Amino acid sequence: MNFDLENLVRENIKNLTPYSSARKEFSGAAQIFLDANENSFGSPLAQNYNRYPDPQQTEIKEKIAKWNNVEPSEIFVSNGSDEAIDLLFRIFGEPNRDEVIICPPTYGMYKVSAEINAVRTKKVFLTSDFQLDIQNIRQAIDNRTKLIFICSPNNPTGNLMRRDAILKIVGSFRGIVVVDEAYIHFSPEKSLVSEINDFPNLVVLQTFSKAWGLAGLRIGLAFANEEIIKLFNRVKPPYNVSQIAQEAILKALENKSQVEKTIAGIIAEREKLIENLREFSFVTKIYPSDANFVLVKTTDAETIYKFLLDEKIVVRNRNNVELCAGCLRITIGTTEENEALLNSLKKLATEDTERTEKFQTG
């Protein structure tokens, strides 16, 4: 494969002069900051947040780089993974000309971001066992295809994509392959971050929203070769990650062992929930999961979904998603939350039985 990054980047991005702050240009430790029109008198809060945050999130990158055996220059910290997804389209997708390949059923923001950025979406559906259709993906690629998005473990199906299949696509495609690993920490497979130095067109996305339990902070990560990361930094807003979020992430990174225990607990609850869901006659299939949720095929997803809403329990109705007819996606909750879900489903099952008996005797 001949990979030419320069040829993939939009012309306006190549010519872009990124926003530059005086602090970025200053070398050394300044003591007085009169450059950014901040409020030097502070705020009503006890802790001062009157200064802009580190635009490069240096400390976070240094810690994460050590864990992943990469360089800090190979990491981009984003305002949630959705920012990184959007920036990929801005960097590589020429509006009204270029194309992206997605593999439904998959995470919906790939298509939304493509449409916002006027990039045409090509759909190559997963196989019947929710794996990549390599042959059809290759056939869908043409000279306008700039990006391929792969979600692994996949949302909403929950399963890992085969590593060898992903790498075959990465190795043969001259554009950018984005592997979204939002749920990788719940799976037995190691991350593809280890492959970024062997594949210059590979971008791996991760997040602090799932395993780390920090969805409210909106922090995502992109791992890629240094030249791609430079493009992210050129296009991103100058202060895309808040000071509060950066401080919280650094604090969380000190408690990795607690996160590992949480992951183990979620996986244990996942397996227990799967076993209990099998007892219901309206559950026809539970798909294998490498994530913190399960995709459940039912006889009547709409009725079950509405019943649970009445019980004040919200699950995700995937009935109208390609290849997911009759399916609900259920996040693994706490033991108490899962028990409440099961009790509500038992209530529904009892009502179904009573209705059936009444019909038969009537």
Range-by-range predicted roles:
Residues 91-113, 127:
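Conserved PLP-anchoring active-site segment centered on the Schiff-base-forming lysine
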Residues 1-59, 63-66:
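N-terminal "arm"/small-domain region of PLP-dependent enzymes with the aminotransferase-like
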Residues 164, 310-311, 320-353, 358-362:
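PLP-dependent enzyme catalytic core of the Aspartate aminotransferase-like
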Residues 104, 120-128, 206, 318-319:
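Short beta->alpha connector loops at strand-helix junctions that form conserved
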Residues 201-279, 286:
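PLP-dependent aminotransferase class I/II
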